[in-house]
Amino acid sequence: MTQTAGRTAWYVERFDEFVRSLNGSSSARLLTQRKEAMDAFVELGFPTARDEEWRYTSLATLLRQDFGVVEKLGEEVLSDVDAWRVPNLQSHVLVFIDGQYQPALSGGASLPEGVRVSNLASLLHRDGEVRDGTSLAPRGKDAFVELNTAFLRDGVHVHVDKGVRVDVPIEVLFVAASPNAAVHPRLSVRVEDGAEATLVERYVSASDHVHLTNSLAEFSLGESAHLDHYRVQDENRAAFHIANLYVREERHSVLRSTCCTLGGGLTRNHVHTHLMGEGVDSTLNGLYLVEGQQHVDNHTLIEHAQPHCQSHEFYKGILADDSTGVFRGQILVHQAAQKTDAYQANRNLLLSDRAEINTKPQLEIYADDVKCSHGATIGQLDEDAIFYLRSRGIGSAAARQVLTRAFAGEVVERIRLEPLRVQLEDSVGKRLEQAIANRA
């Protein structure tokens, strides 16, 4: 039996234990969905290097781990959650520790009428299903999506009514605390016609223990809706992090999504945006900063299905030490999507001769009246620029820090939420300072 097949069987056993632990709290309809998802997972199995989309990312280390479900949380974690909040950010926050919602630690700024924010478990127990956005992720295609459905316990549900403008950011904080814990959170977001909202997702670790986060987010934007979305992953170096995001945009909607990956030992981010109406404006920004033996894999698919839409994708990576990275970005333009304006760029900075990046931007175009461009760069710091700064009295390490911070700053400065931007500038600066010091 192969390692992949063996671990598939192991997860089936854990699923049977999980279902028994629910003690009938899962509705019949949801239980059926769970079992169908597990059947699909068994059929799919874990991806391997033979799968083109996983060609450069091995799951061997993940498959050697025995993950479990946390039943009880430590008091020390519950008392220290403020340490992971964004300083000076006035938000309405939902806090989850090891996948469990913490109402006593949640709340904050009040939300206007027409906005419903809750943890998913409360809806699942009441209705047995969540109706907004749950059909966006394709079924039977991705093993981790199926695992998320099979082991789903909690997550976040956001619904913004038509025409409502939410000035207060909605912040979701996921804290991983227990060793060998596996959590499978779900985010379901619906922004109705003409509504506006800002969502901040943050993932952190409270210890150095191995753990797994396998998240699935589904966002649905109505006509002329606006959503600013920020996702920051800063878990520990022993963490495994799998993230899937599926977005559906109706006509004239605007999405600005920024994904920052700073932590995790092995991280896989997959984003699929589907531009389903005319005049959609979709932006994907990304920054990944990895060092040591970290591995980060970013896959994006922007699908243009209707005319007169524009998309802008800008991902930058900084890789130090023995770290590795993958970027595979695809823009798919259907025949009906005339007058598409699409731009994609992936730029990478290697701070070590041992660091490695595999980048593959792609255009797949079936319309003849479009303006599409893409490109990728891989390089090191400009020695002429370093020499110039040193000639002005700046030390070698400081000069390298100035240049690398400027490189990362092209993404960070696009964050429109000032407290989050300031925090990331500080976090990125400290990481780069350490990475450059290790290089010396």
What are these regions (language model features)?
Residues L123-D127, D132-I394, A408-A440:
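Conserved beta-strand/loop scaffold segments within soluble protein domains that form the structured core
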Residues M1-L216, E223-H226:
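Short, low-to-moderate order helix/coil transition modules at the start of elongated helical scaffolds
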